[in-house]
Structures are given as structure tokens and as C-alpha cells.
């Protein structure tokens, strides 16, 4: 969407030019790099110590940008390996997703974004709410609370947060249609 493109452009054009040759306390600091396998250039990686983020003028400016965009729900921070399951699921607006161990919520945020992805790439096209939804569960009360807090950044009427032992969830048989339109059953556990 246009917000995502604006954030990528901001990283490339507003912040990256100033982060390429940064030195802090006599050491070169590596700039952020794009994660090549993530679609649409939307994921970045950087490994910068906290004192560099807070004290280097160049990185402090980036840090303020990242904190603000995280607070308003435009970006999420997570390990690259945690980005894989939602990508591999290839969630569409009509899908029903059950995440049994969802906290702290970064993968859930990624799933919500996928669920709400536009049905058309036309910028002015009407995109209704998705028909699908996500049930995000965590059995630990404190972690479930953290999940609710994270979910508030991405308000979606298509999200249900639960706090139960995942082994108590019922087995579900869900019909799935394949590319030729036939339906078969997969047991979800």
C-alpha cells in the first residue's frame, strides 16, 4: 500500500544516505540492510548497539523514526526468522487463521496485514473488510496481555485474542479448495 511505499522511500532516501559512513567511538557502524527474501523490500535488518542508537546523531534520528512508526502501528520489529511462518502461510483476505502460541504479537501483526491486503492494486479502489479472521491465542496470561497491547496498534475487527491452553482447543476440520476448485479436508491440530 502507499504507506508501506512511503516508509521504504523514507528509509532509502531520508535515512540511509546519512547512515552509510557512520563511525561511533572510533568504530564503523554498519547501516541497515534490506532483507532480500522479504517481498516488496518491506523488511530491514540492522544490528546496532543501544548506546549507538541513542548517542549517534545519525542513528538517533533513525531510532526516533522507528519508535514513532512502531507506536502508530506502521511497522513492527521482529527477528527475521519469525517473519517466515506468515509468509509461508500466504494469508489471503478470505482465510481463517488460528495461531496457538501468538504472543508477543509480531507474527500476528504480520498476519493481520496479510489478511487486510488489498484485493486490487488500484490506489483508489474500494477494498471491503476481509471475510476471514485470525484467532490469536496464548496460554500465558501475561503474554496474552502483551498480545492484546500489540494488537491495538493494528486495529482490526477481524482479530480475536484468546487466553487458553492450546491443547484444549478443539480439533477442526476445515474444507479447503485447491486451484481446480475441488474441495478436500485437512485436519488442523
Task: Show the residue positions of the predicted features.
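S-adenosylmethionine
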Residues: 1-189
Amino acid at each position: 500500500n502507499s504507506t508501506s511505499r512511503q516508509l521504504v522511500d523514507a528509509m532509502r532516501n531520508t535515512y540511509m544516505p546519512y547512515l552509510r559512513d557512520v563511525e561511533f567511538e572510533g568504530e564503523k557502524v554498519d547501516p541497515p540492510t534490506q532483507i532480500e527474501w522479504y517481498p516488496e523490500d518491506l523488511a530491514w535488518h540492522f544490528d546496532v548497539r543501544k548506546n549507538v542508537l541513542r548517542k549517534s546523531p545519525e542513528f538517533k534520528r533513525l531510532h526516533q523514526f522507528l519508535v514513532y512508526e512502531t507506536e502508530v502501528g506502521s511497522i513492527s520489529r521482529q527477528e527475521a526468522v519469525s517473519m517466515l511462518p506468515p509468509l509461508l502461510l500466504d494469508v489471503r483476505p478470505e482465510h481463517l487463521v488460528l495461531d496457538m502460541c501468538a504472543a508477543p504479537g509480531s507474527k500476528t501483526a504480520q498476519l493481520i496485514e496479510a489478511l487486510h491486503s488489498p484485493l486490487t492494486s488500484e490506489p483508489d479502489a474500494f477494498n471491503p473488510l476481509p471475510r476471514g479472521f485470525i484467532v490469536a491465542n496464548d496460554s500465558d496470561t501475561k503474554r496474552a496481555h502483551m498480545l492484546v497491547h500489540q494488537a491495538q496498534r493494528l486495529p482490526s475487527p477481524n482479530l480475536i485474542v484468546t487466553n487458553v491452553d492450546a491443547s484444549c482447543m478443539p480439533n477442526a476440520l476445515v474444507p479447503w479448495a485447491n486451484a481446480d476448485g475441488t474441495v478436500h479436508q485437512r485436519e488442523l491440530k
